[in-house]
Amino acid sequence: MRTLHRSMAVCGVLAFSTWLFSVLYGFAILDPHRMDWLLQEDPAQAFFGLNYFLLEPLHWPWGSISTFNIPTGTSLVFTDAIPWLSLLVKCGKTLIPFDSPIQISGWWILVCLLLQGLFGLRLFLREGLAPLPSFLASLILVAWPALHFRSIEETPHYTLMGHFLILAALSCVLDWVFRHRFNRIEWAILLTLSIGIHFYLFVMTFLLYTIPILEASWERESSLSHRFFQLLRSETPLLAILGGLAYCLGYFEVPAGDSSSAGFGLFSMDLISFLNSEGFSGTGAFEFMRGLKSREGFQYLGLGAILSIGIGLSSGPIRNLRPTIMAIRIPVIAFIAIFALSSRIGIFGHTLPVFLSGVLEFVLFCMALRRMNPSLSLLPVMFLAGALTGLVHLAGPTLRSSGRFGWILGYAGFIFAVLQLRHRLQRALSPVLLGLVLIQAWDLAPLLDHVKRAFPKSDMSHSGLPSNPQLDSSMHPKPLRILIYGSEYFTPPELVVWALQHHLPVGPIYLPRFDRNRRQAFMEALWQRILKGRLMAGEVIAAEKTEELREHLEEVRKNPGVRIKDMGHYYLILTR
């Protein structure tokens, strides 16, 4: 009977996830040839990365892309094209050829919702909850606002909707906390998946992986140096494999040097951001918090989730129930993650100075580790805290300034609250969770309008890549490559679309990471070629309308081998 109830809970979660997907996003985005909703900001970058990768023969490293963002090239990682899925699609195209370009973002969103529900259900069932309360708690996780916010913000980022990886990692942590069980194979699979989806999700997963690893090391009765070498010996094989995978997928494909880290989350964790509704709340109670942009962290959890966390925390630990008390370590570790990985901590919209934030990280990290394991001497704790803080600050803005690590705290807080309520309420847990689900649904109703406006409807006639007759008539004869001259952020999207349609290399364009020194040298050389009219055969240059170009425009026009076409906000410079 219990197996039947579990099967019904699984079917219920899958049905709810599919229904929510249809209501919020619509089945129209599952059409692989429907691309009209992707041609903006980060989604466009991932779309172009995937399709340029499909155009090229597979070469080493597997995730590298040479014809997109020329002359340096890029990779699946730095276009956020979900490397594992892109490789799967490329293998599928080899076996069963199909027309490209295509998009997989719609299917990725659906898979994320389904796995979010399944991993949430698995977590609660694994911790001894009955199927019905596990099902109800999973519904809140599927409708988690911070998850769906990734699809409707000003620059959508569908790759980061893989929150199921955080839930899977938290489930493994709970397995260690309650049963002292460490499944190395499960962790290895999880880390391998996350490194081939997105760097942020990998770091979050790896951070949670360190909890049982470090705690097991601390429990050994040996010297600090002996513990360190044992830890190094046990973890080196997995770290070596992950490093090899990172190389294969293109993590190191972009040259080092003066590289931009933009696109990897220049955000801060605001301590009240979990109350910031961003207009998603139906209660109106948190409207005064609106306007705290770029402070992700919790985002807004929803009134149902906030109430459940409040009720769970107010019930207090149960006497003589050590596992419940031990579970407090999870939100403590989440706090460590926030303060150790964010140098910009906000309070009511005001960001603390980097130095003060670093001191706060150091103190909280020491206090948290001492709280978890009082047997630790102060010296190694301070050493660990100082080393972590120093390394993170040396890593630059890629990690230290992101408030997205607050996602861990949001999930950990809710999970801890549900497990706490299980012991307090017992049979009354299901009615209470049902009430919280209804409150959550009522509060988040305005979110529907935000999402619906961002996604295409099934009755829209236009779905593929837009044609551009003006570019078609200008590009004669057909060029061999297209170069873009201008500022860092200058990228004419219609030109990149045209280049993809005609299988032409294009670049350089703005991507999350590029070598500024190499780009600057390339731009200077390109500018000299523009002034002298020295275009190579089959080359087209899209030049941004800058003051410098306007001053020298007549000089460029005098070159007999060059013709200039005004495209509105840029010039096309072509050979005659």
Model regions and ranges:
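Membrane-interface helix-loop-helix junctions at transmembrane boundaries of multi-pass membrane enzymes
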Residues: 222-232, 309-349, 363-387, 391
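Perimembrane helix-loop-helix junctions
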Residues: 204-240, 316-319
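Periplasmic/ER-lumenal interhelical loops and adjacent helix-loop junctions
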Residues: 40, 235, 241-316, 324-325, ...
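Membrane-interface coil-to-helix junctions
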Residues: 18-115, 144, 157-158, 277-281
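Membrane-embedded helix bundles of polyisoprenyl
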Residues: 110, 114-123, 127, 131-177, ...
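Signature aromatic-anchored transmembrane alpha helix within multi-pass, membrane-resident enzymes
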Residues: 333-334, 379-383, 415, 421-449
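Extracytoplasmic
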Residues: 438-520, 532
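Start-transfer (signal-anchor) and selected internal transmembrane alpha helices
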Residues: 1-30, 230-239, 327-330, 373-383
